Amino acid sequence: MPDVQEQPGPTRVPILDLLRLAAVGAVILYHYGFWGPASHGVQQVAMPYLAPVAQYGFLGVPVFFAISGFVIAYSAEGRTPVGFAIARFSRIYPTFVICMTLTFLATLLVGHAWFHVTWGQWLANLFIAAPMFGQPYMDDAYWSLVIEVVFYVWVALFLAWGIFPRRIDTIIVAWIAITFVNELTLDIPLFEKLFMADDSGFFAVGLLIYEHYRGRRDTRLYSLLTLAMGTATFQAVHKLERLGVHTHGSFDPMVVTAICIVSLGIVFAATRIKSVPLPDSLVRAVGGITYPLYLLHLQLGYVILLAMTPTPDALSTALVVTAVVVLAWFVWRFLEGPARFLVVEGVQETHALVEECLRLRHGGRDRHVQ
């Protein structure tokens, strides 16, 4: 049976749970202070006066990718490709379906005056990459989840080929080379999606930080880490042109560069801190709510906010964000665990059935040959 248990606790990095919350907090600031969901073609922004600061909150997503690179490298260690895939699927999919469905129902029942949703859209979103089926994401924030899934698929393939993490240096050099070739010359949309060419540097930083965390110390590691951080910073600055056209914002590349370097430096430093002066249950709760909070904060948050008042202010926005945090905690505390258990049981039974069918099929062939 594939190994899908959580990795043992002693080597947890508790401060990463706090950094996850900080990254999600930056994204929430971005969506409530600079760029919210569109209602009938009009962009909703609860507190536009925060825009000069809030506009840089988009960097919370790529910083989260760096944290994900570290966590996924740790999660993959000692697992089979199938075990890793089941563990990742059971981690992200049940919570996604719960939060996406809550967002859909709230929009359908309460937010229909501001936002349009359909059952077809809900059905397409069950596959996460809804635009592949001609439907929009249920929540505009879901685009980053697709990138995460692509990253998981690559890691599972590398595990199957036996080159992860053994050939991590080669993987990262090739990945960064493809990134720059596509970003500077080819500009092929398929390559951008397939190789995560807009965010590869951040994932690479996380993977290399994990190498350092495992005890590796050599010149090549530090050189690659510098290259990956430079790539990540380049990618963040490179996004500004498109982001400026899309949002009509005015971004300072120097500010983006500084935020990237400092944020990635903090992630690196965090892995050297073994404990924090906070209750372990609180730290685990903080880490646990970040995923459902990210999935719920935007569309569902604005549905609640606009139902309260057509002209949001700081107080109403704070109340809504607090309510979404509580809802995220409820999802994590009471719904996520049972849903994950059901998914793991179902996937493991399906995997066992497939293996048994293949075994019987090969057994039949062997007898036929004899």
Regions found by a protein language model. Give the residues of each.
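Residue-level signature of the transmembrane alpha-helical core
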Residues: L21, I28, V97, T101, ...
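Residue-level recognition of transmembrane alpha-helices
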Residues: R20-A23, A87-R88, E148, L298, ...
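Short, charged juxtamembrane terminal tails flanking transmembrane helices
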Residues: P2-E6, R365-Q370
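His/acidic/aromatic-lined binding-pocket segments of jelly-roll/cupin-type domains
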Residues: P62-F64, G201
